[in-house]
Amino acid sequence: MILGIESSCDDSSIALMDENSLKLNYFSKISQEIKHAKFGGVVPELAARLHTKALPEMIEKIKPYFSEISAIAVTNEPGLSVSLIGGVSMAKALSISLNKPLIAVNHLVGHIFSVFLDKKEIFPLGVLLVSGGHTLVLDISANGKISVLAKTGDDSFGESFDKVAKMLGLDYPGGALIENLAKNCDGNLNFTIPLLHDKRLEYSFSGLKNQVRMEIEKAGEISQSVQENIAASFQKTAIAHIMDKLSKIYEMKKWQNFAVVGGASANSALRTKLENLANKYGSTLHLAPLKFCSDNAAMIARAGVYKYNKKEFINYKNLDIVPHLNYENFKI
């Protein structure tokens, strides 16, 4: 079995996956959302302390499986440096004590494998990655080379939801709260879709966020109906922005297989728009189970299986954390 360890942000998670059947034999995740909610966002030092407490307790529970572990896969990039250290340190210690090979996994690559948890991976593949930290449109070739076709120049899709939620007086994280409010209203505010007439294939959510701020200031008192209208109008415009650029890229690439991954990929309105786009081109849309859209170790273990079969191991002395995404070395 492949042991997956994930600690790139505020979720501590481990998983055991059979490298032959892809059966998920063990999965555990401890979310820190409640701990960070009162601060309105993730506090790195607090996240690190909680990882230090949670990971050893989680590993203790899988001791009966130690003899069955073939390799240890761990997220080492990108993420909060103080959080990454927790998982990487644990993986190194286990690698030495159990004499098992180490596998370094890019967190975003892990998200890509979240749509292949129980089935063989399919490449070439188009990918929309939407999360709290990234908004990317990717093209993955048959040999696993990743090309970045579009990315955000400021806030990410998921981050913009969190910030708008905060403006509306909602708790952190705000993505699901915005989505739930939006279900009660069609959204009749005419927010401008960012970069609509700009030929550049890139995303920007800061201007839309500013439009929301001005609407809130104009409204004055924020009643339930005003909250719902702003949330629905914002979500509709943010998704329209995603689809505007993605549709242009889809027309050029005409992918047979397309995936949407990342924490924000759980948004049902976004999924519906993507299903319509895939149907238009006769593509197969790959979606992760809602449980595995957000950060988790099952996807890290699954990416680990892929790398294990290719014998992509790394010596513990050479395994370092990389807080920021290295586009030059971004590959499956």
UniProtKB/Swiss-Prot annotation:
Q: Which note does the record give on the cofactor?
A: Binds 1 Fe(2+) ion per subunit.
Q: Specify the domain of life of the species encoding this protein.
A: Bacteria
Q: Does the keyword Mitochondrion apply?
A: no
**Where does this protein hold Fe cation?**
H107, H111, D295
Give the location in the cell.
Answer: Cytoplasm
Q: What Enzyme Commission number does this protein have?
A: 2.3.1.234
Q: Which GO terms describe its cellular component?
A: cytoplasm
Q: Does the keyword Flavoprotein apply?
A: no
One GO-annotated biological process of the protein? tRNA threonylcarbamoyladenosine modification
Broad class of the protein's primary localization: cytoplasm
Q: Where does substrate bind?
A: L129, V130, S131, G132, G133, D162, G175, N267
Q: Where is the signal peptide?
A: none
- Cofactor names: Fe(2+)
What GO terms are given for molecular function? iron ion binding; N(6)-L-threonylcarbamoyladenine synthase activity
Q: Which reaction does it catalyse?
A: L-threonylcarbamoyladenylate + adenosine(37) in tRNA = N(6)-L-threonylcarbamoyladenosine(37) in tRNA + AMP + H(+)
Keywords in alphabetical order, please: Acyltransferase, Cytoplasm, Iron, Metal-binding, Transferase, tRNA processing
Which family, according to UniProt?
Belongs to the KAE1 / TsaD family.
Question: HAMAP family per the record?
Answer: TsaD (MF_01445)
* Physiological role: Required for the formation of a threonylcarbamoyl group on adenosine at position 37 (t(6)A37) in tRNAs that read codons beginning with adenine. Is involved in the transfer of the threonylcarbamoyl moiety of threonylcarbamoyl-AMP (TC-AMP) to the N6 group of A37, together with TsaE and TsaB. TsaD likely plays a direct catalytic role in this reaction.
- Alphabetized PANTHER family for the sequence: TRNA N6-ADENOSINE THREONYLCARBAMOYLTRANSFERASE (PTHR11735), TRNA N6-ADENOSINE THREONYLCARBAMOYLTRANSFERASE, MITOCHONDRIAL (PTHR11735:SF6)
Q: What is this protein called?
A: tRNA N6-adenosine threonylcarbamoyltransferase
